[in-house]
């Protein structure tokens, strides 16, 4: 057990947390019934929001006066009430963070143990955790994690009419417009947007372009129309 943080608050001075997690993600299948045969045809599956349960332990609770314990519990209630959700970092998961987490279930305080304990259920509407940020200025990169990530590509353009980045499978993003040497082109694959010199240039994305994801493993990217480039991404973990 150790502390945890939620929505920018560090709970470790007040409680110890124990992660209670399922063995795997439960998927939501999409299926279509077919006349004349039993069952249905599986079309695919969706990854629903992740449920994370923490058991909180008030180790110092037995050393507090009744009013102090009441104040502490009120403080914890306030910290856990975040209607807009927040980032959640739990014990035993290293640098992983879940985004868009909101409290959707709680138990009563159990006074069986020395300082009292309770269970708190978080629903993480972005179910794939975020790990370490990575970057590469070469053409070969290694993506860690267990889920595809969407990169950001920054290019320093040469004078010309286009810049392009492509992967080993032939997928590419092409920006076609007049460019001056030194123009900064930023391709955000998550938002499927492009800026040139800080101004929106998404309308200049060429036909056939696809803002591709990078699956875990090795990749080789090619760049054209630029004198320098940097690829940044964040590891994603189930």
PLM regions: where:
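Solvent-exposed loop and beta-edge segments used for protein-protein assembly and interaction
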Residues: 46-50, 80-82, 112-114, 145-147, ...
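Short amphipathic beta-strand/extended segments with alternating polar/hydrophobic composition
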Residues: 11-16, 97-104, 172-178, 202-207
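Intrinsically disordered, low-complexity coil segments
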Residues: 59-71, 178-180
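Short amphipathic alpha-helices in soluble, non-transmembrane regions
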Residues: 68-81
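Polar/acidic, low-complexity leader/linker segments enriched in S/T/G and N/D
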Residues: 1-33
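Oligomerization/assembly interface segments of phage tail-like spikes and tubes
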Residues: 32, 37-64, 114-127, 219
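Intrinsically disordered, low-complexity segments enriched in serine, threonine, and glycine
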Residues: 128-238
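Short beta-strand and beta-hairpin "edge-sheet" elements
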Residues: 82-128
């Amino acid at each position: 057990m150790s502390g945890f943080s939620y929505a920018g608050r560090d709970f470790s001075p007040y409680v110890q947390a124990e992660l209670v997690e399922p063995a795997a993600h439960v998927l939501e299948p999409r299926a279509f019934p077919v006349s004349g045969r039993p069952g249905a045809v599986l079309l695919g599956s969706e990854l629903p929001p992740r449920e994370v349960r923490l058991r909180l332990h008030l180790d110092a609770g037995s050393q507090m006066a009744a009013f102090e314990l009441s104040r502490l519990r009120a403080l914890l209630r306030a910290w856990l009430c975040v209607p807009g959700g927040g980032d959640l970092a739990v014990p035993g998961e290293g640098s992983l963070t879940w985004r868009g987490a909101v409290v959707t279930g709680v138990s009563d305080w159990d006074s069986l143990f020395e300082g009292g304990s309770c269970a708190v259920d978080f629903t993480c509407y972005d179910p794939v955790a975020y790990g370490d940020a990575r970057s590469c200025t070469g053409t070969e990169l290694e993506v860690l994690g267990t889920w595809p990530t969407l990169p950001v590509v920054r290019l320093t353009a040469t004078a010309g009419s286009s810049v392009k980045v492509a992967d080993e499978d032939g997928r590419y993003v092409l920006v076609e417009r007049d460019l001056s040497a030194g123009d900064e082109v930023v391709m955000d694959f998550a938002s499927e947007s492009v800026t040139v010199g800080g101004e929106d240039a998404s309308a200049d994305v060429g036909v056939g372009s696809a803002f591709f994801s990078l699956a875990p493993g090795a990749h080789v990217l090619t760049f054209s129309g630029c004198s320098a480039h940097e690829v940044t991404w964040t590891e994603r973990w189930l």
